[in-house]
UniProtKB/Swiss-Prot annotation:
Keywords: Electron transport, Membrane, Mitochondrion, NAD, Respiratory chain, Translocase, Transmembrane, Transmembrane helix, Transport, Ubiquinone
Record has RNA-binding as a keyword: no
Any one Gene Ontology cellular component term annotated for this protein: NADH dehydrogenase complex
Spans traversing the lipid bilayer: 42-62
Gene3D superfamilies in UniProt: NADH:ubiquinone/plastoquinone oxidoreductase, chain 3
Name of this protein: NADH-ubiquinone oxidoreductase chain 3
Function according to Swiss-Prot or TrEMBL: Core subunit of the mitochondrial membrane respiratory chain NADH dehydrogenase (Complex I) that is believed to belong to the minimal assembly required for catalysis. Complex I functions in the transfer of electrons from NADH to the respiratory chain. The immediate electron acceptor for the enzyme is believed to be ubiquinone.
Recorded GO MF terms: NADH dehydrogenase (ubiquinone) activity
EC number: 7.1.1.2
Location(s), subcellular: Mitochondrion membrane
Encoding gene (name): ND3
Xref: InterPro entries: NADH_UbQ/plastoQ_OxRdtase_su3, NDAH_ubi_oxred_su3_sf
Cited Pfam families: Oxidored_q4
Family per similarity comment: Belongs to the complex I subunit 3 family.
């Protein structure tokens, strides 16, 4: 999200440097097309996290039940 700064219109010295005038987004160029391998890598990491999260969610009650039974 980029908001329009009114000082940019009033200031006569306009910064024409692309690096300084663009927002910083974790090293990514916001005007450049995002490559698919990066998206797929984050998608795979998210799926692995969800699988382990659901596994812990399902196995933790079984551990508590086994500990409480004589």
């Amino acid at each position: 999200f980029y908001y329009i700064n009114p000082r940019e219109f009033v200031n006569k010295k306009v910064c024409l440097d692309r690096e300084k005038s663009s927002p910083f987004e974790c090293g990514f160029d916001p005007l450049e097309f995002l490559s698919y391998p990066l998206f797929i890598r984050f998608f795979v990491i998210t799926l692995i996290f969800l699988i382990f999260d659901v596994e812990i969610y399902l196995l933790l009650p079984m551990v508590y039940l086994n500990m409480s039974s004589p």
